[in-house]
Amino acid sequence: MKEETFYLVREDVLPDAMRKTLEVKKLLDRKKADSVADAVQQADLSRSAFYKYRDAVFPFYTMVKEQIITLFFHLEDRSGALSRLLQIVADSGCNVLSIHQTIPLQGRANVTLSISTAGMADDINTVMNQLRKLEFVEKVEILGSGA
């Protein structure tokens, strides 16, 4: 059997049928629809399109469950900043595997975190949004992920 190749694609460039397939899957997962027929009707998608894409399109966070993710942060140098950042990661259920922090220069520091998402209660997008909202975080991005 041929090994599957996956790509990370921004939602806004996906065809409507794929976006709506993700919406149908979300409706079913959250029990907001009683059946596939009900969910596709709510999402305005044909059942055939749903069945065509249902096993081919996934939210990013479902692909990184039980994975290791490396995050990069550019932070203002403030007392307690790293502690607050780590608290959000811990509250999400992630396990911190490694931390690397540069010495602050000109009031800024870089932090690289490798985390295990096996116990993550939230999806990665929720965690990333919480981290971005911290007033001392200038930049946060996913550098990579792997098993």
Curated annotation (Swiss-Prot):
UniProt domain ACT: residue ranges: 70-145
Annotated transmembrane regions: none
InterPro entries (alphabetical): ACT-like_dom_sf, ACT_dom, UPF0735_ACT_dom-cont
Disulfide bonds: none
Protein family according to the UniProt entry: Belongs to the UPF0735 family.
HAMAP family: UPF0735
Protein name: UPF0735 ACT domain-containing protein BPUM_2431
Organism of this sequence: Bacillus pumilus (strain SAFR-032)
